[in-house]
Amino acid sequence: MSTRREFIRQAALATAALSSGSLFSAGAMSRTKGIVIGANDLIRVGVVGVNSRGLALASSFAKMPLCEVTCICDCDSRALDKCLAQIESQTGKRPKGFADIHKFMESRDFDAAVIAMPDHWHAKAAIMALQAGKHVYLEKPSSYCPSENYRILEEAAKHPELVITAGNQRRSWPNIIAAIDEVRGGSIGRVRYAKSWYTANRPSIGRGKAVPVPAELDWDLWQGPAPRVSEFHDNYIHYNWHWFYRWGTGEALNNGTHFVDILRWGLGVEYPTLVESVGGRFRYHDDWEWPDTQMITYQFGDAAAGSWEGRSCNSTPVDGYGVGVAFYGENGTVLLGGGNEYKILDMKGAVIKHETSELTFEPGNLINPSERLDQIHFKNWFAAIRTGSPLNSTIRDACISTQLVQLGNIAQRVGASIAVNPVSGELVNPSPEASALFTRDYEPGWEL
């Protein structure tokens, strides 16, 4: 594997290449087809990892104009069969199904890969897709650990003909864009501090018992780049992997990534200079390893400060919202909840502006309630592929925002504040423990 400094050098080269989404002004090239995808061409999509979010993405992409979901991949045949049936019921066409991601990426039957696998797979799958000549939609977080962010940027810089974006879909939601314009345009004066949060009331995952691997699951493929475990436990999958160090990244990257990304966007900052975290697994005594209660704070030099509060087991709202971001300025506050709306409050807390939209969540859509909003983000990716227009969420921005939250998790696990180079994102004079968490061990043969 390359050294971290080599990652950073490659990331700097990637910045210019990725800032506009594509270097091809008349449409991006996909080596899958070997031709330019033009403004009116069909884009063939393959989706990998379809148990939950991937099923929602596949269903939503299948409804897009000039798009066909042609390939589906999952190493659990139950998830694969369910998704294949869903797309067939929507479109009348049954996509090709793959259990093995290697064979999926080799297929010439799709141009663009949508990656919605568990977190430990994100960077590996994105790199495989780029190397196979696929455009990439990478669900958040962009990676499992900071070193993988640099590796993704290194690989993306080698393929300027391909368009890679990330699932930070709120960067395309109209009223979120308008709210950031308010913040950065001076509507509340200079902003020096912003906070973000996520609340839920998740149950215990209990103490797992060793059981046989389900016959429908290829457990080796599911583990992929992660070091192997000796036993399969009944509380590992499909969602609980989020809470284990080996595969997941905790609530901070499961949901915090979305809102720290908005925070960073509004403040106009990149890497911090200092990161601290407090918290722990407080609510239940079970196998859940990441915190269920966490407060991460960021110092961005003399420019600004920010924070993220995560409460996985106490859903009491903050400022009326279960999730959100608040920007505090000299003359008031811009407040965003989880949907496509925002408020401006004066210094006494009175609402002086409330922007809403008919584009909102659809409770009746049980597969993807935010589908209409998410499809705006998908359209932006497709436009970048077809015409080279700018991405709303570049992979560079996604990697930086992901890394901010990863740095908070490192501080949490080492139990100490960490200093960060604000230009490169590297740790400054790190402890051996912090350095070890900047990267990870890989299963032999599965390295990036």
Stretches found by the model and what they are:
Residues H135, S143-L221:
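A contiguous active-site-proximal alpha/beta segment in oxidoreductase catalytic domains
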Residues R31, I177-A178, R190, K195, ...:
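Contiguous beta-strand/loop segments that form the cofactor/metal-binding neighborhood of enzyme cores
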Residues V50, S172, E371-Q375:
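Generic alpha-helical segment signature
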Residues K140, G186, G388:
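Conserved G/P- and acidic residue-centered "switch" motifs that form tight phosphate/ATP-binding loops
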Residues M1-L138, S147-V163:
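N-terminal glycine-/serine-/threonine-rich beta1-alpha1-beta2 phosphate-ribose binding loop
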Residues D76-A79, F98, P118-H122, S142-C145, ...:
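Short, solvent-exposed turn/loop segments enriched in Gly/Ser/Thr/Pro and often Arg
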Residues R44-V48, V69-C73, V114-A116, Y137-L138, ...:
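Structural recognition of the beta-strand scaffold that forms the well-ordered cores
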